[in-house]
Amino acid sequence: MPGATEKGSELSERIESFVEALKRGGGQRSSEDMARETLGLLRRIITDHRWSNAGELMELIRREGRRMMAAQPSETTVGNMVRRVLKIIREEYGRLHGRSDESDQQESLHKLLTSGGLSEDFSFHYAQLQSNIVEAINELLVELEGTTENIAAQALEHIHSNEVIMTIGLSRTVEAFLREAARKRKFHVIVAECAPFCQGHEMAVNLSKAGIETTVMTDAAIFAVMSRVNKVIIGTKTILANGALRAVTGTHTLALAAKHHSTPLIVCAPMFKLSPQFPNEEDSFHKFVAPEEVLPFTEGDILDKVGCHCPVFDYVPPELITLFISNIGGNAPSYIYRLMSELYHPEDHVL
């Protein structure tokens, strides 16, 4: 079957190019682009590969998922999408297998903790399983397209006239959130520049083009200005399993200053950023880049006397966060474990 061979080789090339892009840091892709591309590839794997039952398919998805995740462990969105697809396979198989919705209800925390060791039999063959899974993935892709709009639609509930809002760095989700609020409310945004990458400057330009009164300041001035701020609104790279954040460097400083002044800290993040990871997973948590922006090579005399590290992310503990705003509404950090059980199966937390 030359057609099938061509399709297989084309899919392999697409997966290879995606893996190579991940190894290089993902290029200019946003987390949403990563999620969409991962889902597209997984959908192609499901339709193009040969498999006879849900068990074989899940093993295939796990294998390809591990390969993608190994290319860039800090890009948690890829692993999250793999886990979502595994959950979809389990649900569609359960429906065809005759399991009732009542028995598939999300279990209590106690049951989730004590359910280890029980594994389901996925060896039965169902002809319509593939079409059902693909349809569910298509629905998930449609949901992904509307995540930013759904978060932005909640802006007027949280931002009021004449407020002073502080944010840090560049977040497309926060930008859309503030732009939506600015259509009906007048407020002032202070953007911390997020050195050494200084993405806050781009954020400030984008907001000022939208007619929002914007001020850029250095990260060192965060604490001094915080007493004037009504709310802190930030984005994040990942929401961890304990309700903490893995966000751009400087976010922890901002969160501590907000806590000291009892200023509410709101995190705008879509559900695909929710990860079953914990902060002690070293490989996937930390990411360091060249410290050239901090200590340029022109400082020749000092270079051999100093070891310089430039981390990309900060860890922000859950007790510093007031509210998460996602595409399904607002939730407290303590509710994250519940959302986790709705999105991912406990057996898929470690692929």
Swiss-Prot record:
InterPro entries hit by this protein: eIF2B_beta_subunit, IF-2B-related, IF_2B-like_C, NagB/RpiA_transferase-like
Main location: cytoplasm
Activity regulation, per record: Activated by the chemical integrated stress response (ISR) inhibitor ISRIB which stimulates guanine nucleotide exchange factor activity for both phosphorylated and unphosphorylated eIF2.
GO MF entries: ATP binding; GTP binding; guanyl-nucleotide exchange factor activity; translation initiation factor activity
Record's subcellular location: Cytoplasm, Cytosol
Organism domain of life: Eukaryota
UniProt-listed GO biological process terms: central nervous system development; cytoplasmic translational initiation; myelination; oligodendrocyte development; ovarian follicle development; T cell receptor signaling pathway; translational initiation
GO CC annotations on file: cytoplasm; cytosol; eukaryotic translation initiation factor 2B complex
Entry keyword set: Cytoplasm, Initiation factor, Protein biosynthesis
Family: Belongs to the eIF-2B alpha/beta/delta subunits family.
Oligomeric and partner information: Component of the translation initiation factor 2B (eIF2B) complex which is a heterodecamer of two sets of five different subunits: alpha, beta, gamma, delta and epsilon. Subunits alpha, beta and delta comprise a regulatory subcomplex and subunits epsilon and gamma comprise a catalytic subcomplex. Within the complex, the hexameric regulatory complex resides at the center, with the two heterodimeric catalytic subcomplexes bound on opposite sides.
Free-text function comment from the UniProt entry: Acts as a component of the translation initiation factor 2B (eIF2B) complex, which catalyzes the exchange of GDP for GTP on eukaryotic initiation factor 2 (eIF2) gamma subunit. Its guanine nucleotide exchange factor activity is repressed when bound to eIF2 complex phosphorylated on the alpha subunit, thereby limiting the amount of methionyl-initiator methionine tRNA available to the ribosome and consequently global translation is repressed.
Full protein name: Translation initiation factor eIF2B subunit beta
Organism: Oryctolagus cuniculus
Gene: EIF2B2
